[in-house]
Amino acid sequence: MASLLDCGAGLASANASFSTATDLSQENGLFSSWFERCSKTQIAVTIFAVLIAYDQFMYIWRKGSIAGPAFKIPFMGPFIQALYPKFDAYLAQWASGPLSCVSVFHKFVVLASDRDIAHKVFKSPTFVKPCIVPMAETLLRPSAWVFLQGRAHTEYRRGLNGLFTNKAISTYLPAQEKVYDDYFERFVAASEANKSKPMAFMRLFREINCALSCRTFFGDYISQDAVEKIAEDFYQVTAALELVNVPLSVYIPFTKCWRGKRTADAVLAEFASCAAACKANMAAGAEPKCIVDQWVLHMMESKRYNDRIAAGETGAEKPKNLIREFTDEEIGQTMFTFLFASQDASSSATTWLFQILAQRPDVLDRLREENLSVRGGNKETPFELSMLESLPYTNAVIKELLRYRPPVIFVPYEATKKFPVTPNYTISKGSMIVPSCYPALHDPQVYPDPETFDPERWITGDAESKTKNWLVFGAGAHDCLARKYVPLTMAAMIGKASLELDWVHHATSQSEEIRVFATLFPEDECQLVFTRQG
């Protein structure tokens, strides 16, 4: 009986196999017949149409109910607009809704203009990671500390916090004072060479900020030639920082991404060399004068402590900043992330600060008077950290400048998993989510008459209490490490300039038009004439 059942099962199986094979043969025959009847062009057009339909379907599915174009330009999306961004287009995008989207090539990008949604993104490290822009990991290296998450990021950042204490910052000021002396002389010389006719100062403002950063990071370990070359070449890095790049363009010679990568590699090598020189100098007993000096000093103190503990000593005093040892390459890489974060933002802030104060002599006169008073009437007195607390109006000017023309208008993140941004919208894994800072800083409900530059709102108004809207330095685990250092250096720069220089802004039809180049700049590049005060 069993054998009969087995035989029947075998026959049934054979019949089923034969039937399946026959069906497949018929299907293959149909496909073969179709392919034979179609030309190569027809096949290519069909495949292309299927890909377009898939690309369109994925865009519509990801878009869901949020604002954005109803359909996507096949494959590339608004790539041309991304290459040449217009500030008015950003304003329109932010105004279209609290969440809006675009899709460029393979990247789906959601912009968050709502303040509370921006805070949620900044404070959701389990759902998102900073990506800055897609090219950032290539330029900075994937191992850079800014891309670390969780405990690894927290511990690395804790070790860097000690570089921005009041005590540490005070050691950087003499080097910065020398930079101001040098470049203020250059500003005047440039105007004289141009026969006191207005000229664009945006390039020199980029250079002074690069010099400030490099001297603050490395002191005299870096040469002036290297500083000037980095200031000139770093433009290539900024140019590569488009929100979305052509895929694989970093491997195509002479593209923006290719040039940016070469520049980044050269800067990293220079910074690693400076780190090695610093270690040798500090090992010889030198006093710290720059950020890397302070960092290496903390490493040396930590090593001595660990050695004493390892030797069984019980009374060893634990350093305030107990950290591991870092290689020259790690130090160089970290300083490069600082330069990466500061160069364009600081250059933008400096450009607008000099332009706006030239347009507002009432503000400049009051700032000048305050800075002379805090120096006891002697304009030659160097800036000291203790002066900052005695400069309420200068601080208000800096804060209003950072609100009025924020140097960071948004911070791109990438979703590491499905992220329920709102109860009604979930962003898919791998998509970019971009919390925007500008709308919160120009909210008329929080800052009345937001398009007017008004430092007084920080003194007699209630702007100081609107902390949730103060997104200049971001929020959450990845907020700006230098949120105290940045206003300090700006106050030092403009305070010294107000006492030593006069400058006149020659307005053009493009002075108030905003160019988007990583951050915000005046379209005419700030037409000024500098002279020495009598």
Swiss-Prot record:
Pathway: Steroid metabolism; ergosterol biosynthesis
First-level EC class: oxidoreductase
Binding site for heme: 480
Ranges that cross the membrane: 43-61
Keywords, comma-separated and alphabetical: Endoplasmic reticulum, Iron, Lipid biosynthesis, Lipid metabolism, Membrane, Metal-binding, Monooxygenase, Oxidoreductase, Steroid biosynthesis, Steroid metabolism, Sterol biosynthesis, Sterol metabolism, Transmembrane, Transmembrane helix
Single GO molecular function: iron ion binding
Cofactor(s) needed for function: heme
Pfam families in alphabetical order: p450
Disulphide bridges: none
Subcellular location: Endoplasmic reticulum membrane
Keyword 4Fe-4S set for record: no
Keyword Metal-binding among record annotations: yes
Assigned protein family: Belongs to the cytochrome P450 family.
UniProt name for this protein: C-22 sterol desaturase ERG5B
Originating species: Gibberella zeae (strain ATCC MYA-4620 / CBS 123657 / FGSC 9075 / NRRL 31084 / PH-1)
Name of the gene encoding the protein in the UniProt record: ERG5B
